[in-house]
């Protein structure tokens, strides 16, 4: 029976011990310190350091708090350890400092493992007294946590400077190519961190260039020590009136706050007694009255729990001993009696005086600064308002690549309005919002004539006129013949041009050189008119051609251009003599065309006879010259009519190779020119046909196909004008 119980209990004990071992292994941190030695009973303590790392320490079951504290200090290689302590939370969620003179298991009731936190216990009133760089680094980490948690309140300007020191210590000098304002949003410095603060931190960080991490941390501490609540250990209490107050323990004394208002300060030398009983804390202060006599004032505060009251009392005793005494109070070796009143707690560590006098900095120390916790980066909306653009073109280009941000300085579109000026202006075609009828295109700035877009005589911009023309007139015939009309409102100009034809020989040669290579037919111009504004979508090729081609422009045709056309026609007549067979064929064609045409009016365009003299040549030489002249005139006519478009039903056009232009010299007195009801009639003269043997070519004004009727009013009849025949072509 006894053996059975022994085996059963033994197995249970072994099984229980194995489960504890597995639990300790699972709960161990990345850094493990086995300090239990050969002890059979082991406890595991897990300590959270200031840099965010965890350390697990195995200790004997009856180990005291000082043993755990020494293991952590040895792991950190920290000499100035009296400023720090290990803190834990009890079942009532009251924070306590681990007492080095008592057992860990008796103090920390929650475990195993027993969780503790390394924190700064006493904030040095003068950070320059901290000799070790590691000590200052840990102080900076503690203050950073205090500001982030809201325990240490900080003004905006001071918070910006402290955050900039943190960036300088962790990231080094600011680099334009590597660092951007959005980088600040990856860090957290204050509870409520706005974009304005992040931009201010970023700009302040640039000013701290050249500081080493140690220098930045020293400047951080020297700035933080002037904060009102620096190093204040706050405890919430209640007074006799039932209102909540806060007692703050500082190196100089005890502060009393009502809400956020400081209402009193009790200096340590003036405090004569400080004790507690259950949840009541008694504070006796000696002050001088008006007569110079000392008077005692007693203050009684209540706390929610007796443990909280005792914790406040112990913290007050430690602050008084550390900052005010040269050395700790020695405990008496003999007992005062069987009955002992009050707590036996006494501060057993070194004082600030001892720490600054005895500790000396080592010659060489090395430690690793761990990076801070990063958060997701956010895009700053205020970035554009803080950066002045240097080049509007660069910003506009970047805005077209990404539509999420609004570009700076986007130029407003130039409206297309009618103008009396015929000069070319710079018009910027602006993108419009995408609709069902339009699509967005790239913006272009092209030379464009304003009158070209608004001229009522231009077929591309007057769709309504074309519609009305097609309704009232006959449909366009097949392109067997091309009738060329003249505008009678240029009569006086032609008189002056006839006198200067001899001076335009060089211009004619240049025109023939430019028209040697014929451009291909351009696509038609797309016109879109909405309710807001008129937008003409032109390709660059079409737009330039519309400007260069005077036949499509509604403005006045330059005189030199008309002179060149006239000169080409005159030279063709002077150099060409028709063969008998060709003349016979042409006369027959003219007679057929004359039967279907209308009579000309008497307001004929005169031609100076002095400048138009027929040239007679042999039939063998005129054959080759006729072909060259025909090609040149064909190029001129094609350049004039290449951009005209027909909005009616497109007729069947034969191959370009089958169309051969032939110049016809009318022999009859009257020929027709234009559609029925729209052509202007001119009267021919018999004297010209009989005297010269063939009709002379009359110099036309700007040439327009009869599909686009001239809006100029007809001139009155002039009997003094001499009548000439009009040149026509047959395809």
From Swiss-Prot:
> Which residues does the annotated region (Disordered) include?
352-388
Which InterPro entries does this chain map to? Answer: Band_41_domain, Ez/rad/moesin-like, FA, FERM/acyl-CoA-bd_prot_sf, FERM_2, FERM_central, FERM_CS, FERM_domain
Q: Which tissues is it found in, per the record?
A: In the retina, expressed at the outer limiting membrane, retinal pigment epithelium, outer nuclear layer and outer plexiform layer (at protein level). Also detected in the inner segments (at protein level). Expressed at the basolateral and apical sides of the mesonephric tubules in the kidney (at protein level).
Chain intervals for the UniProt region annotation (Required for interaction with CRB1): 29-119
Name-wise, this protein is Band 4.1-like protein 5
One Pfam family here: FERM_C
What GO molecular-function term can you cite, just one? protein domain specific binding
Per the record, the GO terms for biological process are: actin cytoskeleton organization; actomyosin structure organization; apical constriction; axial mesoderm development; axial mesoderm morphogenesis; cell morphogenesis; cellular response to transforming growth factor beta stimulus; ectoderm development
Per the UniProt record, the lineage of the source organism begins with: Eukaryota, Metazoa, Chordata, Craniata, Vertebrata
* Subcellular location(s) of the protein: Cytoplasm; Cell junction, Adherens junction; Cell membrane; Photoreceptor inner segment
- Give the UniProt keywords, A-Z: Cell junction, Cell membrane, Cytoplasm, Membrane, Methylation
Q: What does this protein do?
A: Plays a role in the formation and organization of tight junctions during the establishment of polarity in epithelial cells.
Q: Which GO terms describe its cellular component?
A: adherens junction; cell leading edge; cytoskeleton; cytosol; focal adhesion; nucleoplasm; photoreceptor inner segment; plasma membrane
Cite the record's Polar residues compositional bias ranges: 378-388
Q: How does it assemble?
A: Component of a complex composed of PALS1, CRB1 and EPB41L5. Within the complex, interacts (via FERM domain) with PALS1 (via HOOK domain) and with CRB1 (via intracellular domain). Interacts with CRB2 (via intracellular domain). Interacts with CRB3 (via intracellular domain).
Q: Please report the stretch or stretches of sequence annotated as the FERM domain.
A: 43-327
Q: Write down the membrane topology.
A: Peripheral membrane protein
């Amino acid at each position: 029976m006894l053996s059975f119980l022994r085996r059963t209990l033994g197995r249970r004990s072994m099984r229980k011990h194995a489960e504890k071992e597995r639990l300790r292994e699972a709960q161990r941190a990345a850094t493990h310190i086995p300090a239990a030695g050969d002890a059979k009973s082991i406890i595991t303590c897990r300590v959270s350091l200031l840099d965010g790392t965890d350390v697990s320490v195995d200790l004997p079951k009856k180990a005291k708090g000082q043993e755990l504290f020494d293991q952590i200090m040895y792991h950190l290689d920290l000499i100035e350890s009296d400023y720090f302590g290990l803190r834990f939370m009890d079942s009532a969620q009251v924070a306590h400092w681990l007492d080095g003179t008592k057992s860990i298991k008796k103090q920390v009731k929650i475990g195993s493992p027993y969780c503790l936190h390394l924190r700064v216990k006493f904030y040095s009133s003068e950070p320059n007294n901290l000799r070790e760089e590691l000590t200052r680094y840990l102080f900076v980490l503690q203050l950073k946590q205090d500001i982030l948690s809201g325990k240490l309140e900080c003004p905006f300007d001071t918070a910006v400077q402290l955050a900039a020191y943190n960036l300088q210590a962790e990231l080094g000098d600011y680099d334009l190519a590597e660092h951007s304002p959005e980088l600040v949003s990856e860090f957290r410095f204050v509870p409520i961190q706005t974009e304005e603060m992040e931009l201010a931190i970023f700009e302040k960080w640039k000013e701290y260039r050249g500081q080493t991490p140690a220098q930045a941390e020293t400047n951080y501490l020297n700035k933080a020590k002037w904060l009102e609540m620096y190093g204040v250990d706050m405890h919430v209490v209640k007074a006799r009136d039932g209102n909540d107050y806060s007692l703050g323990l500082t190196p100089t004394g005890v502060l009393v706050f009502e809400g956020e208002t400081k209402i009193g300060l009790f200096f340590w030398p003036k405090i004569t007694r400080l004790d507690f009983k259950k949840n009541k804390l008694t504070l006796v202060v000696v002050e001088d009255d008006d007569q110079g006599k000392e008077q005692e004032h007693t203050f009684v505060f209540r706390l929610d729990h007796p443990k909280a009251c005792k914790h406040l009392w112990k913290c007050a005793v430690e602050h008084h001993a550390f900052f005010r005494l040269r050395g700790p109070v020695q405990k008496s070796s003999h007992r005062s009696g069987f009955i002992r009143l009050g707590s036996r707690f006494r501060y057993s560590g070194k004082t600030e005086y001892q720490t600054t006098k005895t500790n000396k900095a080592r010659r060489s120390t090395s430690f690793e600064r761990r990076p801070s916790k990063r958060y997701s980066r956010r895009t700053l909306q205020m970035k554009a308002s803080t950066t002045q653009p240097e080049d509007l073109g660069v910003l506009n280009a970047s805005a077209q690549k990404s539509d999420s941000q609004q570009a700076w300085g986007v130029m407003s579109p130039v409206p297309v309005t009618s103008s009396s000026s015929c000069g070319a202006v710079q018009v910027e075609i602006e993108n419009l919002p995408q609709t069902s009828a339009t699509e967005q295109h790239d913006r272009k700035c092209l030379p464009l004539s304003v009158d070209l877009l608004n001229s009522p005589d231009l077929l591309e911009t007057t769709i309504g006129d074309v519609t009305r023309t097609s309704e009232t007139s006959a449909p366009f015939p097949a392109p067997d013949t091309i009738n060329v009309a003249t505008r009678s409102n240029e009569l006086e100009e032609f008189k002056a041009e006839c006198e200067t034809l001899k001076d335009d020989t060089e211009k004619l040669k240049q025109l023939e050189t430019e028209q040697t290579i014929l451009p291909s037919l351009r696509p038609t111009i797309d016109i879109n008119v909405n309710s807001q504004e008129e937008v003409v979508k032109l390709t660059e090729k079409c737009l330039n051609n519309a400007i260069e081609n005077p036949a499509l422009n509604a403005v006045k045709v330059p005189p030199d251009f008309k002179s060149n056309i006239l000169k080409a026609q005159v030279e063709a007549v002077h150099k060409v003599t028709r063969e008998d067979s060709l003349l016979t064929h042409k006369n027959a064609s003219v007679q057929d065309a004359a039967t279907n045409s209308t009579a000309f009016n008497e307001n004929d365009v005169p031609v100076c006879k002095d400048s138009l003299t027929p040239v007679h040549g042999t039939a063998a030489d005129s054959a080759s010259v006729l072909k060259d002249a025909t090609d040149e005139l064909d190029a001129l006519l094609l350049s004039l009519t290449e951009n005209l478009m027909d909005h009616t039903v497109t007729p069947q056009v034969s191959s370009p190779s089958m169309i051969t232009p032939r110049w016809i010299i009318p022999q009859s007195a009257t020929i027709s020119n234009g559609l029925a009801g729209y052509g202007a009639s001119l009267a021919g003269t018999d004297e010209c046909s009989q005297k010269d043997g063939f009709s002379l070519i009359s110099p036309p004004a700007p040439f327009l196909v009869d599909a686009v009727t001239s809006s100029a009013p007809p001139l009155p009849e002039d009997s003094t004008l001499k009548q000439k025949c009009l040149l026509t072509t047959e395809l």
